[in-house]
């Protein structure tokens, strides 16, 4: 995993993707010396939560990524659909390292995630395979040199959509149009 360009992976359920995800991607591109950021939607939630269909979340990520040059979408977890370790970051990183042997990888995580790494499958392996880039989250201890992302959550966005409330400004316009056209997250 030496040499080559470094790709920052921004993983998540993206259920739906929102502007704080794009802020994290832009910050990583602008300040962390990475060549690209790949949005990496989870094929299924690592802790079993119900998600919108993967193809819908993948398409919403594609639509969101169009807002920023250098941000792309990686559907690698779908390639691992039959693997018993699908959704485990260590397994996804191993898959990507084998598929792209000339790339180096970084993993963008929120400060809130650092408290949960004990629950992760093979966090030690994740750290071997990727440089960890931590972005701040409001309500968590500050991260030196990193901005605090606004407290926007996909959970709150889904709840607002289910109540018929406006979420403009919280999700990219293209994503909102897709959500409305596909009638996602309606109570």
UniProtKB/Swiss-Prot annotation:
The keyword Transcription does not apply. It catalyses: nicotinate beta-D-ribonucleotide + ATP + H(+) = deamido-NAD(+) + diphosphate. Its EC number is 2.7.7.18. One of its GO terms (molecular function) is ATP binding. GO terms for biological process: NAD biosynthetic process. SUPFAM superfamilies: Nucleotidylyl transferase. InterPro entries: Cyt_trans-like, NadD/NMNAT, Rossmann-like_a/b/a_fold. Keywords: ATP-binding, NAD, Nucleotide-binding, Nucleotidyltransferase, Pyridine nucleotide biosynthesis, Transferase. It holds the Pfam family CTP_transf_like. CDD domains: NMNAT (cd02165). Pathway: Cofactor biosynthesis; NAD(+) biosynthesis; deamido-NAD(+) from nicotinate D-ribonucleotide: step 1/1. PANTHER family: NICOTINATE-NUCLEOTIDE ADENYLYLTRANSFERASE-RELATED, PHOSPHOPANTETHEINE ADENYLYLTRANSFERASE. Catalyzes the reversible adenylation of nicotinate mononucleotide (NaMN) to nicotinic acid adenine dinucleotide (NaAD). Belongs to the NadD family. This is Probable nicotinate-nucleotide adenylyltransferase.
């Amino acid at each position: 995993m030496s040499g080559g360009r470094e790709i920052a992976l921004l993983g998540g359920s993206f259920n739906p993707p929102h502007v704080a995800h794009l802020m994290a991607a832009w910050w990583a591109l602008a300040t962390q010396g990475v060549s690209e950021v790949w949005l990496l939607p989870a094929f299924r939630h690592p802790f079993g939560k119900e998600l919108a269909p993967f193809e819908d979340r993948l398409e919403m990520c594609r639509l969101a990524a169009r807002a920023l040059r250098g941000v792309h979408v990686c559907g690698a977890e779908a390639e691992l659909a039959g693997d018993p370790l699908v959704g485990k970051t260590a397994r996804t990183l191993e898959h990507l390292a084998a598929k792209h042997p000339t790339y180096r990888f970084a993993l963008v995580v929120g400060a809130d995630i650092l408290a949960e790494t004990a629950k992760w499958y093979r966090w030690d392996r994740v750290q071997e395979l990727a440089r960890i880039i931590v972005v701040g989250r409001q309500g968590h201890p500050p991260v030196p040199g990193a901005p605090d992302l606004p407290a926007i959550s996909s959970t709150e966005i889904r709840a607002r959509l289910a109540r018929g409330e406006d979420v403009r400004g919280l999700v990219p316009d293209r994503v909102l149009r897709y959500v409305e056209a596909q009638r996602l997250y309606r109570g």
